[in-house]
Amino acid sequence: QKIADQILCVKGDHVCYYGTPEQIFEEQTIRELYGIENGFYDPRFGSIELPKVDGEPEVFVIAGCGRGIPIYRKLQKDNIPFATGILYTNDVDYQLARLLATEVITEKPFCQITQEHLQKAMQVMEKCKKVICTDVPIGECNKGLEELVLAAKKRM
């Protein structure tokens, strides 16, 4: 993918796709090529992800900056529905959470977390049986996460 100018895809005994890496490594193309019916190909990671677990979220994950990825995959593997937030839509955690989480509370990139999104996250978190707080860095823009973390710690 990184060094090829063109890619030829063969399925069975015939050529089914030919094009640039950008054309080939698209979610729909990979799904059709490999017959992925219940799961996702994520072109950002170049990985195939299993489908999200259905149901009301049992766990709320406070994450960001890639800290949630291993937790999301573990919860999905253990068949536990989960919610996560508050994630910026340009955060690497968001890219996977959108595929695996039953609910993702988001914020616009580089914006301060709004009260509306903070309250939504609090409501979803309150309905969950368990909360996992990652060591997501907190700065000026995502300072609202401090309130969410404090509320989670009070539940312990």
What are these regions (language model features)?
Residues 119-124:
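Short amphipathic alpha-helix with an adjacent loop that forms part of the alpha/beta core around
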Residues 8, 12-23:
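Conserved switch/coupling elements of ABC/ABC-like ATPase nucleotide-binding domains
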Residues 35-116, 133-134, 139-142, 154-156:
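ABC ATPase nucleotide-binding domains
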Residues 21-22, 27-34, 144-156:
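P-loop/Walker A phosphate-binding loop and immediately adjacent motor/lid segment at beta-alpha junctions
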